[in-house]
Structures are given as C-alpha cells and as structure tokens.
Amino acid sequence: FFIISFFPCEKKSYLRGNEVFMKHYDIIIIGAGPGGIFSAYELATKRPNLKIAVFEAGNRLEKRKCPIDGKRVTKCIHCKTCAIMNGFGGAGAFSDGKYNITNEFGGTLYEYIGKNKATELMEYVDEINMAYGGEGTRLYSSANSSFKRVCLQHNLHLLEASVRHLGTDKNYEVLSNLYNLLKDKVSFYFMTPVQNVAIMDNGDYEIITENETYTCEKCIISVGRSRSKWMEQICHNLEIPTNSSRVDIGVRVELPAEVFAPITDELYESKIVYQTEKYQDRVRTFCMNPKGAVVTENTNGIITVNGHSYENPALHTKNTNFALLVSKHFTEPFKDSNEYGESIARLSNMLGGGVMVQRFGDLIRGQRSNPKRIAESFLTPTLDATPGDLSLVMPKRILDGIIEMIYALDNIAPG
C-alpha cells in the first residue's frame, strides 16, 4: 500500500532503559526495487527536508553477486537472500533493462489516474533514466509497424508500445548513478528485511526488523514478487482488502536469433497476443531478449528462469529468448493464485532438480529430452538445465495453449 506524506513532522525521541535514541523517520520505504527507488528519488529531490529511510532485504548494487560462475558453481545453491532477485534495483537490476511506455500491458495504473497521466509518468521515468546514464539508447516503437498487419493475418495481435532498451550493462549504470545521488539524501538499510508493519496508537507506523524497531509517519511498501506472500500477510494484519489476481504460467523459449531477427531488429520487444482456438485462453509473448541469455532466479526457494540481453554487441549470444505466458483468472472460492503458480514451479524443480529444458520436437512427440538429444540440436542452450518432459509438469490446458501459440508464431517467424 502507498501512503506518502508531503508535510514535514517533528522528529521524536524514544526511551529504552536510560538510553534516548532516534529511530523515527518521516517516511520509510520498504523495498529498493524500481518502486522504492523512484519514490525515494521524488521525495528526496522535491522535499529534501524530509527524513527518509529505505529498507531492503538484499545487498547494495555493487555487492549483488550470484555465486554461479559456470565453472565451480553451475547451478543455484539456494542462498538465503538471492542476489539476482533482491538488492538495490530489485529483480530487474540485471535484466535487459526494458522500459515499456504503454497502457496496453504491464499494469493497470491508468485505471486510477487515467491513460494520459499514466503515459506522462512513464515518459517522466524515461527522462530520468536518460539523465542518469541511459542517453544514446534506442527507443523502439510498434505504432506504425508493418508487422501489425502480418500478425492479424494469423490471428495474432501486436500490442502498441514504445520500448526503451537500456541493456543489462546500461541499466546497471543508471541504477548505480541513482544510488550515488540518493545515498547522501536517504538512509539505506541493506540486508535488513522487514518482518512486520504495525499501526501504533498515535497513528504512526512501527517497522519491525530482526534486530531493531523503527517508526514513521508514512510508509511505502514496494517489495515485488519475491515477498508477495509477506505482503499478503501484512495486508491481512492491517485489514487491507485484497483480491485474487491473475497468474501467468508459461515457459521461456530459446531459438536461433536469426529466426526472430526481422521482428527484433525493428521492434526489439514485441508483445504479441493470441487467443487459442481450443479454450479461448489468451497467450502472449513476454520479455523478449534478442541475442540474449537465459538465467536462473530464486523466488521463495523455487528456481525459475529469466532472460538477459546486453546493449554491448560484444556480449551478444547467437540465441534469442522470450517467455510465452498463459494468463488465468480465478474465481471464488479459490483465492491463492500465487500459490497455484508456485506449486507448478516446485513440481518442475522436483522432477528436474532445478530448471528443466526440453526440445520442442520432443514435446510434440511426447518424448522426454535427454542430454544426447539436446546435444544433437542445432541450437546450444545458454543455460545448463536438466533435460526432461514438460508435459509431466504443466497442466494440459496451459501446455496446449503454449503449443498452439508456437505454431501461430511460426507463421510470422518461420523456424
């Protein structure tokens, strides 16, 4: 929940034994992902008189180091705090740095403030990124793309958006510059996960960590996917109503970069939506990474995958990867959509000992992939994963939708 005060308040002292100590802030921000960073940026630059603190479960940017080096450590070792998912910059700190400027996907902010205002804010974020290291990067647009017509001919819909691609390298630079700006204006508490948030008798908020308790007049919570379960509990404790949102379930597809080059060279990130004939479910592409790599993530102890790509051509690979997601909305009495998605990921981890990979041809034939069959492929996966059988993991309806979508995409990008 987002509660921001724009009025300075007096600083308060608290007594512990005979010791008087100061642990009160005007505003405390929980989470140093994009939501927390830009909240701190706005408050610190426009109201510098406010006393602000940011609490983050992970580490500062330069100390976020995943132990997987491809040599001594090749698979996730389940660190207590995942350096990829947690820390300054959030889960997207090492992603390919795509910022979408559109109301057609990526959130429903426009439902609260209107489409024009939502677009203005997205463009404002883009201006900040450009000012802090992103200058010179390309802004792609699908507004007048000829691929719209090509997609429609095959029952595919190319969503309209402008996409700023920073690349993993430039994205890191922007985040580093923002941190250097904020570190002298805001108190950062790294490796300090918040355990609980409570409302005090005077209306202030009590922020409880493992070793200390802090107070504030206003609190912003922006913890992201990795602490979504914790957020649900906080909402329950504070009697904030919630509802079961959709869950996106799918796979990450990797193929030779040449196959999608006609699309990625023009659009870079193409959000393509398809409605399946069999179930009328919506399937969409997500997080496209031209000449990128597939990487692992640890979310609540579950190993999943993401995609990275770099602006620097020297760091390009021969493959392009993207996610194919099927969106499901649940109705009463079911309320735990997050748990539904996580249970599928846990099953994949159980069967594959981590991330599972399968050749599309093997999937269609109902045949489990094995190391020999993976090695015989013309494509070399960028991630070392366990060959397996996705049909033993994914619900049939979800898998049918993904297969149908792949055949539809083959009409616009043969291969």
Model-derived features: where do they sit?
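Residues forming the flavin
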Residues: 23-106, 143-145, 149-415
